[in-house]
């Protein structure tokens, strides 16, 4: 299930709207309630002017909530920043990929993407 710019319920008072989320199926479960961190397989933010805000404000929230993997499409530097292994409010694994490199989501290893 893929949702674009839809709210994600992190807590009672936090509902950011990531640019894209890949969620556990079925789609019907999200008709009546917002997705929560447990539903997220992959979250993607696309950032140009919001790059610093996404890194400094959103990433710690996502890590604290246990979102397993976040991809930050860094348009300023033409990089894909891959954040994995959330622990203690931050991501322990960070990879920077150039456009020609391929990447596979941790929870969907059979999918290989060239991100550019």
Kindly label every feature range from the protein language model:
Residues 3-65, 72-116:
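C-terminal interaction segment
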């Amino acid at each position: 299930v893929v949702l674009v710019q839809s709210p994600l319920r992190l807590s009672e008072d936090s509902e950011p709207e990531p640019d894209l989320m890949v969620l556990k199926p079925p789609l019907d479960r999200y008709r009546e309630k917002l997705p929560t961190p447990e539903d997220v397989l992959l979250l993607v933010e696309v950032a140009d002017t919001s790059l610093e805000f996404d890194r400094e404000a959103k990433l710690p929230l996502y890590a604290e909530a246990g979102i397993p993997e976040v991809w930050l499409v860094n348009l300023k530097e033409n990089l894909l920043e891959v954040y994995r292994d959330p622990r203690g409010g931050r991501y322990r694994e960070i990879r920077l990929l150039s456009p020609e490199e391929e990447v596979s989501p941790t929870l969907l290893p059979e999918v290989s993407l060239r991100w550019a």
